[in-house]
């Protein structure tokens, strides 16, 4: 007789299945207990394909590009700002006397007075030397001429004698009035820098010879130059190379522009002959003595 075996196989299969489920549950329980989450061993795993460029990636890349261009723009603005500040500082360098402290101005004035004292002492020394040469009957004509030329040059420089020669005649009208002391100082300094050898400032009634220690104070419409009060219009005579002196007045941002900025008007005329007749009186010096 044959026996029917399917029932035990089914039982065995059911038992195996039950065992596998028990192991899986135990493994999952153990994974949860250990803090790991894993798929069952018989669970199919999905394949990870290549990453695609998303809209977020494009936005991030666009943001980086904008950041680079923004940084370059900021750097360009900084460079332009530095250049502008440098230019402004160079343009305003002529106005340093306006912002100088009174103590600094006193030191500057004292140094100019010492310079004038030295020049006056040298003039006196040369005059004494010339007198000694003439008194001794020295026939060295070259030495006499050299001493006389040096004495004449220094005498003109300190304003002890008059002078004549080519130069410029400057007229400053100030209807405002607006020409302040620093504007007049700028005109004097520009002429000196251009090689003016003798300068004289006039108004309708007074004349002042500009020296190495000349100072200007006051208010627009009433300028005090070396203790003399002058009123507009002002006339300035300067001896030197006429084209050079005229060009110095017309430098952009220079003396003529400074007069225009405050409402004044400057006219510069070149001349073959300019006569500077005002003199400066030598000052008695208490401390400075000529060096032998």
Curated annotation (Swiss-Prot):
Residues 1-28 form the signal peptide. One of its GO terms (cellular component) is plasma membrane. It is a multi-pass membrane protein. It comes from the Bacteria. The chain crosses the membrane at residues 68-88, 152-172, 229-249. It is found in: Cell membrane. Residues 1-30 are annotated as: Disordered. Keywords: Cell membrane, Membrane, Signal, Transmembrane, Transmembrane helix. Pfam families: DUF881. Its main location: membrane. Belongs to the UPF0749 family. This is UPF0749 protein Rv1825. It comes from Mycobacterium tuberculosis (strain ATCC 25618 / H37Rv).
């Amino acid at each position: 007789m044959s026996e029917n075996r399917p029932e035990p196989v089914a039982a065995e299969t059911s038992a195996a299945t039950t065992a596998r489920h028990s192991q899986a549950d135990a493994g999952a329980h153990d994974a949860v207990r250990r803090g790991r989450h894993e798929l069952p061993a018989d669970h199919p795993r999905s394949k990870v394909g290549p990453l695609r460029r998303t809209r977020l990636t494009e936005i991030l890349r666009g943001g980086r590009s904008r950041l680079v261009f923004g940084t370059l723009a900021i750097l360009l603005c900084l460079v332009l700002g530095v250049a502008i500040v440098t230019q402004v500082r160079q343009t305003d360098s002529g106005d340093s006397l306006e912002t100088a402290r009174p103590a600094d101005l006193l030191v500057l004035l004292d140094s100019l007075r010492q310079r004038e004292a030295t020049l006056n002492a040298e003039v006196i020394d040369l005059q004494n030397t010339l007198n000694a040469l003439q008194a001794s009957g020295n026939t060295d004509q070259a030495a006499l001429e050299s001493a006389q030329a040096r004495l004449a040059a220094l005498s003109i420089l300190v304003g002890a004698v008059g002078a004549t020669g080519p130069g410029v005649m400057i007229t400053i009208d100030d209807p405002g009035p607006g020409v302040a002391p620093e504007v007049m100082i700028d005109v004097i300094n520009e002429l000196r820098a251009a090689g003016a050898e003798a300068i004289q400032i006039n108004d309708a009634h007074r004349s002042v010879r500009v020296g190495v220690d000349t100072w200007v104070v006051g208010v627009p419409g009433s300028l005090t130059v070396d203790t003399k009060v002058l009123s507009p219009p002002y006339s300035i005579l300067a001896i030197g190379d006429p084209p050079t002196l005229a060009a110095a007045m017309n430098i952009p941002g220079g003396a003529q522009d400074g007069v225009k900025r405050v409402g004044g008007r400057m006219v510069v005329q070149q001349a073959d002959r300019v006569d500077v007749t005002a003199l400066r009186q030598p000052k008695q010096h208490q401390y400075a003595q000529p060096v032998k």
